[in-house]
């Protein structure tokens, strides 16, 4: 080993965007992302999750094969890829394919032009996923050359290119359009609103020549020549080297054979506890490293492990072959191989599959009980594995391997062999998986794979099973298993209903989830469903086919009512989950206030796509910067007796721990404060009050060291003399634990409820519904950088929606004047309310550490900590009593509402008025309520997009649907009957109702729900359900009313001597397009001084970052009205400037802008103006209206829901920027889909969040949005009291997503009706939020298969 030790100082050499970098003295555990962001100027790749689950960090990695003289390139997660494994590789980031200096790439320009970037944090990763998919398609052989300007990629491939990338802002539709614009098989006219041609205008036709030019990947060199030369040179040197091990960097070893691996591992160089064996390291996304490792053995360069051997017997795949490579290999094989490849393509995401290895997946399943799809599928296919332990090599079945005790690090998986089942017509091979996402990164609840050899019985047409293999995956067992008892039973049987029924009964005894498994009954039901589907396919008549003549009213062409006409296509057997995404946008453009009203691109979108846009964590670390990570309590109510650290490499990196004692003497222990709602503690003092509460901040030299050290903390708790924690609303009620609602925030009841109930023909007493929480999942986690300054001053760069309150809190905590604290926020990588009060804690903790240590301190929360501490949306329990007439007219409603607010008030006292405000969209006759804010020992809940309104609107729909079900009438009839007329609207909403001409809800609702198109679609749904047993559809139309408040707002406009313009506003750019609208307003307001009406000024305007020492009384960014109020403040500033400049303009006549400003400057005209706009006291709020129709398809066997189509009509007033408002509508709607359907926020018995990462918390992805997504923005009427007659768009459209939940209820009702004859359940049922797959399946019936089979068997 002498030569290896001597070589240990060799540098890892990589090329980054064509530049050479040597990594010397780098921690061997350094990831590529960490290296890029700390050792290079690159900032495009972002840390979004650290799990390979979000795509924010995606880069393209290129490798050079000097022997073949070939470069291969693929996308990869830089957060998982270790730098030490990339010696002599090239890395290309978003900056490398295009930037502001060298010119933007077509991908970047199209993402910008299709309005596909909002907060922009995810955009560089999106960009590289798309770029990689284009490069792969264009290099593929056998594909025809595409027309000029297009790629070889297909529209279907383009959609899947970003299937693993998360975006919380856009709703994905514009991203999909940008992707598909490269595909030659797409109709450009079908693409959505963009900046390249004006849709809906006769002389503006879609044309490839109008799109930014694309000429393949030739313009970007991903592998520089100098690196090729180095590789060739190193090969020559290696030929004379007797060592079989290559050593790079500090602690990286690359054995070249299996034998050398064992010799190396058994040497005295390694301590098994600190060495890590890696091939791709993607497993660390699932099983996080709990400590640092100082040595790594990279087995990916062992040729035998990457070999692929084909023969007549099958294919042998080396253990380090990537999943993507395996898919490519198997796709060229027989039917069984192709089916395996198809299933593997649904595992992980493209950028993970490109590096994750087949062997690594199997090893995790065997050693760590990983929920592997691959193990299940290969098990059913009869695969064997070759393993080597020391000098002993053996070939055993995969089943035997999985059953063995967990293998140790010395056991090397060499290869996996899959037999070739040939073209035997008697072989049937099927695979199944149920996961929250069809294509995205989601572990399945259950997966299964079945292989049978059978022959057809001539008399019955059913199959005689000769042999069968039934494999089932992660249902709560340690690993995939074969259902041997069931297999034994089935062999020799002719498949029939009685046989399947008995097989199902046997299976339920085999599939037994371990204790503690989530949704155990659902998982068993899934296993039964999959066996049923498989065996039914081998019968004649039992597996009832979908009616091939049932029309599909969801995917249509043409327009009707401003949406889409319903020329029905024929329903096919294509899985609706994989239908292509279609869309249409309708809106009215106005030139009245140009450039206000133009759908211009979002300011900075191209910079966001290239990765040049600077977020807080992109700011270069100051000299001597330290890094912090929270140590938090895992107990909800306990004395903190002490904090220690385990003896580990990570704990050795701790510099200090900042705690309560480090707050200055004159300071206070506050982590957030509100003059009206109270304070929340920054540190535990001395009793933890909830799981997730901050105990202290670990300080270390790097962010990774801080993260890892925090994991090594050991907290000593004591619950002596403490009461049990209050965790639920039921606990709070029992202990009378409540916060008070200030009188000025309390909603007002309407009418006399008791009298209203006495007038009712029917009554529902104590109806109930529950709504759970939702996590923000902004792509950029909480982050701050604190830099101490002279004279006890401090500057903080914070990702915050409340810079002013952050300043106040930091100052109070440190005991210094407010003017000593400067908060700067340029842009926020997603907020949704989560960067409001919750961001203050991080900033304040950072400030305390920096103030104490007199050094800069930076904190960037890891995703798990962020999710645990964030709080999220308020969960609540609702009970209601409602009276109504026989015709459906409601007479009175009383609601008992218990809201889980957490440990502090935060924004909770403002929730009741919001809930009631959204609830009042219907005329309830009389409305009363009893709302309690429950104080509990959980992290305080905070504002999340449409806080309270989202729940209130849904509660109204749940009640209306209950009434409709009770009366057995169409729900829309109840909705329409109880919509307000203007008189009742005024009673319920007062001044917010505005003028009669602005009340557009009835018109909108009738446009959708009363249209012939809707009636036809409803009939199609009913017809479909009559012909489909195992898939049911539902359609629903939901109206919304949303009350928004106008707030005072400052604005400042400064004209420079060259005519360029700097604008400051109190609001923060969080992706909502604030800067864009402000630019347009500035140009409009100053436009009367210009001959072109101000359009030429757009490029001269720059909106600068929020700075609390420059712009005081900035208020907060939230409530959906920040953009319009900021615009009005700017307009007011501009008006003053215009008055000063007008005399010069009038005197000179025609005068270019630059000359006008030059003359004004010479004349000493003041060229800056600060204004503070306040709303008219008689008009401080207004109502927003909209409605949505959603149509869904529910798989009765699995609970999976596909949103076939959503049609949204939203009254946006006279839009300040239709492109921005459209993006807000679509993004809010999709975020709402997550809340109502799929985002499962789960805690343990101590209230600690356990769905704490991308592996367990599933926000919507490109494959879960509506397959047809139509949006119409309407302008109901002028209203001079609003800002240029505009309306808010950020939050109200989220409420429309309840239409999906309501449509799901209709589909479930159809399923329950279908099986009513077999002991089905009531057609009136409670359906809580979110309606996840397990909930949907349970409501459809966990035992529908058994009941159906019993029915068939009885007829046999």
Curated annotation (Swiss-Prot):
Self-association and partners: Aldehyde oxidases (AO) are homodimers and heterodimers of AO subunits.
Family: Belongs to the xanthine dehydrogenase family.
Domain (2Fe-2S ferredoxin-type) ranges: 10-97
Keyword Iron-sulfur in annotation: yes
Biological process, per Gene Ontology: abscisic acid biosynthetic process; auxin biosynthetic process
Binding site for [2Fe-2S] cluster: 49, 54, 57, 79
Domain named FAD-binding PCMH-type: residues: 245-437
Classification via PROSITE patterns: 2FE2S_FER_1, 2FE2S_FER_2, FAD_PCMH
Keyword Ribosomal protein: no
Cross-referenced InterPro entries: 2Fe-2S-bd, 2Fe-2S-bd_dom_sf, 2Fe-2S_ferredoxin-like_sf, 2Fe-2S_ferredoxin-type, 2Fe2S_fd_BS, Ald_Oxase/Xan_DH_a/b, Ald_Oxase/Xan_DH_a/b_sf, Ald_Oxase/xanthine_DH-like
Name under which the protein is recorded: Probable aldehyde oxidase 3
A molecular-function term among this protein's GO annotations: oxidoreductase activity
UniProt cross-references to SMART domains, sorted A to Z: Ald_Xan_dh_C, CO_deh_flav_C
Cofactor(s) of this protein: [2Fe-2S] cluster; FAD; Mo-molybdopterin
Segments passing through the bilayer: none
């Amino acid at each position: 080993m002498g030569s290896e030790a001597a070589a240990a100082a060799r540098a890892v050499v990589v090329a980054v965007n064509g530049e050479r970098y040597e990594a010397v003295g780098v921690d061997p555990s350094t990831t590529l992302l960490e290296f890029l962001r700390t050792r290079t100027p690159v900032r495009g790749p972002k840390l979004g999750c650290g799990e390979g689950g979000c795509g924010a960090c995606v880069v393209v990695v290129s490798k050079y094969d000097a022997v073949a003289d070939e470069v291969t390139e693929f996308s990869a997660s830089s957060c998982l890829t270790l730098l030490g494994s990339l010696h002599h590789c090239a890395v290309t980031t978003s900056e490398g394919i295009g930037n502001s200096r060298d010119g933007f790439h077509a991908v970047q320009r199209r993402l910008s032009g299709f309005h596909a970037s909002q907060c922009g944090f995810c955009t560089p990763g999106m960009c590289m996923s798309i770029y990689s998919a284009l490069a792969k398609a264009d290099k593929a052989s056998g594909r025809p050359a595409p027309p000029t300007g297009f790629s070889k990629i297909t529209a279907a491939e383009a959609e899947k290119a970003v299937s693993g990338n998360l975006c919380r802002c856009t709703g994905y539709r514009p991203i999909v359009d940008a992707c598909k614009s490269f595909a030659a098989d797409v109709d450009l006219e079908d693409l959505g609103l963009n900046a390249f041609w004006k849709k809906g205008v006769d002389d503006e036709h879609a044309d490839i020549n109008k799109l930014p030019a694309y000429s393949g990947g030739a313009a970007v060199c991903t592998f520089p020549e100098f690196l090729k030369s180095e590789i060739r040179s190193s090969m020559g040197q290696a030929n004379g080297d007797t060592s079989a091990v290559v050593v790079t960097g500090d602690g990286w070893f690359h054995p070249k054979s299996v034998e050398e691996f064992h010799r190396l591992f058994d040497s005295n160089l390694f301590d098994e506890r600190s060495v890590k064996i890696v091939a791709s390291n993607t497993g660390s996304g699932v099983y996080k490293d709990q400590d640092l490792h100082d040595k790594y053995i990279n087995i990916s360069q062992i040729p035998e492990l990457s070999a692929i051997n084909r023969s007549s017997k099958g294919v042998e795949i080396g253990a380090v072959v990537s999943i993507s490579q395996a898919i490519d290999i198997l796709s060229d094989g027989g039917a069984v191989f192709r089916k395996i490849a198809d299933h593997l393509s649904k595992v992980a995401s493209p950028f993970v599959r490109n590096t994750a290895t087949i062997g690594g997946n199997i090893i995790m399943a065997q050693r760590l009980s990983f929920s592997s799809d691959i193990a299940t599928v290969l098990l059913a296919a009869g695969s064997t594995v070759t393993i080597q332990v020391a000098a002993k090599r053996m070939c055993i079945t995969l089943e035997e391997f999985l059953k063995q005790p967990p293998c140790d690090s010395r056991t090397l998986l060499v290869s996996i062999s899959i037999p070739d089942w040939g073209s035997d017509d008697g072989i049937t091979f099927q695979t199944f998986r149920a996961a929250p996402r069809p294509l995205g990164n989601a572990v399945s609840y259950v997966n299964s794979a079945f292989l049978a050899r059978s022959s057809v019985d001539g008399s019955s047409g059913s199959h005689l099973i000769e042999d069968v293999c039934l494999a089932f995956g992660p249902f709560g067992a340690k690993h995939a298993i074969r259902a041997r008892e069931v297999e034994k039973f089935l062999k020799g049987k002719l498949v029939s209903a009685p046989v399947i029924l008995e097989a199902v009964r046997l299976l339920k005894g085999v599939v037994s989830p371990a204790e503690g498994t989530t949704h155990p009954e659902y998982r068993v039901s899934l296993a039964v469903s999959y066996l049923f589907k498989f065996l039914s396919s081998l019968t004649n008549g039992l597996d009832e086919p979908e009616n091939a003549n049932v029309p599909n009213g969801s995917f249509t062409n043409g327009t009707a009512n401003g949406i889409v006409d319903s020329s029905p296509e024929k329903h096919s057997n294509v899985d609706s989950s994989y239908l292509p995404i279609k869309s249409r946008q309708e809106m009215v453009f106005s030139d009245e206030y140009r450039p206000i009203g133009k759908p211009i691109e979002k300011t900075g979108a191209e910079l966001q796509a290239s990765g040049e846009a600077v977020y807080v964590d992109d700011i270069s670390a100051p000299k001597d910067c330290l890094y912090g990570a929270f140590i938090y309590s895992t107990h909800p109510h306990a004395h903190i007796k002490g904090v220690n650290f385990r003896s580990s490499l990570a704990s050795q990196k701790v510099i200090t721990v900042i705690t309560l004692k480090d707050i200055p003497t004159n300071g206070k222990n506050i982590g957030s404060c509100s003059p009206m709602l109270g304070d929340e503690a920054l540190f535990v003092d001395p009793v933890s009050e909830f799981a997730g509460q901050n105990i202290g901040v670990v300080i270390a030299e790097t962010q990774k060291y801080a993260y890892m050290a925090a994991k090594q903390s050991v907290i000593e708790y004591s619950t002596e003399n403490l009461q049990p924690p209050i965790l639920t609303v039921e606990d709070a009620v029992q202990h009378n634990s409540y916060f008070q609602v200030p009188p000025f925030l309390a909603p007002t009841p309407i009418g006399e409820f008791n009298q209203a109930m006495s007038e009712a023909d029917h009554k529902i007493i104590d109806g109930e519904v529950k709504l759970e929480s939702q996590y923000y999942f902004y792509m950029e986690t909480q982050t701050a950088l604190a830099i101490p300054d002279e004279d006890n001053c401090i500057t903080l760069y914070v990702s915050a929606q409340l810079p002013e309150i952050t300043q106040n809190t930091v100052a109070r905590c440190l005991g210094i004047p407010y003017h000593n604290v400067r908060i700067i926020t340029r842009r926020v990588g997603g907020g949704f309310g989560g960067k409001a009060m919750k961001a203050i804690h991080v900033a304040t903790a950072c400030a305390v550490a920096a103030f104490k240590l007199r050094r800069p301190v930076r904190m960037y929360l890891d995703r798990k900590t962020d999710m645990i501490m964030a709080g999220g949306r308020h969960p609540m329990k609702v009970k209601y009593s409602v009276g109504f007439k026989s015709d459906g007219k409601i007479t009175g409603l009383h609601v008992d509402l218990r809201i889980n607010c957490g440990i502090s008030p935060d924004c909770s006292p403002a929730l009741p008025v919001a809930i009631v405000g959204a609830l009042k969209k219907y005329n309830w006759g009389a409305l009363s309520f009893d709302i309690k804010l429950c104080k509990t020992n959980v992290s305080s809940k905070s504002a999340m997009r449409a806080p309270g309104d989202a729940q209130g609107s849904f509660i109204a729909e749940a009640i209306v649907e209950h009434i409709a079900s009770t009366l057995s009438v169409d729900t829309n009839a109840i909705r329409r009957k109880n919509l307000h007329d203007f008189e009742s609207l005024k009673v319920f909403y007062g001044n917010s109702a505005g003028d009669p001409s602005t009340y557009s809800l009835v018109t909108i609702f009738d446009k959708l729900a009363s249209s012939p198109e809707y009636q036809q679609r409803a009939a199609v749904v009913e017809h479909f359900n009559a012909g489909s047993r195992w898939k049911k559809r539902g359609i629903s139309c939901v109206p919304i009313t949303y009350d928004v408040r106008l707030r005072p707002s400052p604005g400042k406009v400064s004209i420079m001597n060259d005519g360029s313009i700097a604008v400051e506003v109190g609001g923060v750019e969080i992706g909502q397009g604030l800067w864009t609208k402000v630019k347009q307003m500035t140009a409009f307001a100053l436009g009367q001084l210009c001959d072109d009406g101000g359009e030429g000024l757009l490029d001269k305007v720059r909106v600068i970052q929020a700075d609390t020492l420059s712009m005081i009384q900035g208020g907060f960014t939230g409530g959906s009205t920040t953009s319009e109020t900021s615009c009005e403040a700017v307009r007011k500033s501009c008006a003053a400037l215009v008055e000063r400049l007008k005399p010069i303009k009038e005197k000179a006549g025609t005068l270019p802008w630059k000359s006008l400003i030059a003359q004004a400057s010479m004349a000493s005209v003041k060229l800056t103006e600060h204004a503070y706009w306040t709303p008219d006291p008689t008009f401080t709020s207004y109502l927003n209206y909209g409605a949505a129709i959603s149509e869904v398809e529910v798989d009765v066997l699995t609970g999976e829901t596909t949103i076939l189509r959503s049609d949204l009509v939203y009254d946006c007033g006279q839009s300040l920027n239709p492109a921005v408002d459209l993006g807000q509508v679509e993004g809010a709607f999709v975020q709402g889909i997550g809340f109502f359907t799929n985002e499962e926020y789960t805690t343990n018995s101590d209230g600690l969040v356990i769905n704490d990462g991308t592996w367990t918390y599933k926000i919507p992805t490109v494959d879960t949005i509506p397959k047809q997504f139509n949006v119409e923005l309407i302008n109901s009427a002028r209203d001079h009291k609003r800002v240029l007659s505009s309306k808010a768009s950020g939050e109200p459209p989220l409420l429309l997503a309840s239409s999906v939940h309501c449509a799901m209820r209709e589909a479930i009702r159809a399923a329950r009706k279908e099986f009513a004859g077999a002991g089905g359940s009531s057609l009136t049922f409670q359906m809580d939020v979110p309606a996840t797959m397990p909930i949907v399946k349970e409501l459809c019936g966990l035992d529908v298969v058994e009941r159906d089979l019993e029915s068939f068997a009885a007829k046999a």
